[in-house]
Amino acid sequence: LCAQTRSLTKDAQGEISETSDVPTSFGAYQPLVKTEYWPDIDWNNVERCPGCPEEDIPFVLGAGYAATKRYWTYLRGLEGLVHYGSDEAYISLKVWREGGRCVLLKDVVIGHVYRMEAPYRMHSEKQVFNSLLISSLLYPQSLRILSFTGAFLKSPETARPSECWKRRTNISAN
């Protein structure tokens, strides 16, 4: 389940207000033509089922999403990811591949103050690893090859399929 996200901003005095120039989003989707690593997801700003209190969405994204502990454990959560990045794509793809669905609850709205920069150091090699791990575990071969090729062209030293394959084998075996 995914809540509707309301974009908020915080000014220099710490006052929080709704961001007026950000359109309402309805979950997220995976663009197939993108200059970033795969899997990458973008906000979906098109409502497919106006008037409905909920609708299926390709990917969860934003301030709040939830599952029962039992289902999370069954899916093995975010096991295998080594750092922040690709969390929503990973869990969403696992849900769909397992036969579940990602559902947006339009009446549940959570405000989220988005920051311009992360307060922690971004580790691009770990983000690349996460993307390649997800590709190797959850994509069909044709998309897996495309994902690895894109990662290699962007960063040959971090796109080592052998490392992801070792990690994939360990996760798949458990």
Question: Where on the chain are the PLM-derived regions?
Answer:
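Conserved donor NDP-sugar-binding/catalytic core segment of glycosyltransferases
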Residues: 1-34
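Catalytic cores of nucleotide-sugar-dependent glycosyltransferases that transfer UDP/GDP/TDP-activated
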Residues: 3, 9, 66-67, 109, ...
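Terminal low-complexity segments of carbohydrate-biosynthetic enzymes
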Residues: 14, 61-62, 123-174
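A recurrent flexible, glycine/aromatic-enriched loop bordering the glycosyltransferase active site
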Residues: 41-66, 125
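Active-site rim elements
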Residues: 55-56, 80-82, 116-122, 149-151
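Donor nucleotide-sugar recognition loop
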Residues: 59, 69, 73-104, 108-110
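Short, well-ordered loop/turn and helix-capping segments at boundaries between secondary-structure elements
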Residues: 101, 116, 137-141
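Active-site donor/metal-binding and catalytic loop motifs
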Residues: 105-121
